[in-house]
Amino acid sequence: MEITNLLEFSHRAQLRDWFERHAATDKECWIAMYRVKRPAECSGCLPYIDVVEEALCFGWIDSTLKRLPDDRLAQRLSPRRKHSHWTELNKQRCADLEAQGLMTDMGRQAFALAK
């Protein structure tokens, strides 16, 4: 699978802004990120939890993970399909995000199909 539409964000709010503008129309994106700890030299990447939580807020899901040449990772995100499998962890994350007021209508619709 080829990495296309690689996006780099320094802050979670930038990713959320991208989702607000593109979640309803785009079919996929790849997000530059790191998995555990943020290296001091890693600008233009987000932690995994920020990426997955924002994706869930808009009804998207993370899937394929690839290593980039500079040792960062690229996480593929795409809209959830109607009858896709939801892990209990992601169901709990959605409930937590809803309680924080972060879920969008798109995210709520995707989550409602999982119940």
Predicted regions and their residues:
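Charge-dense, helix-prone N-terminal extensions
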Residues: 1-115
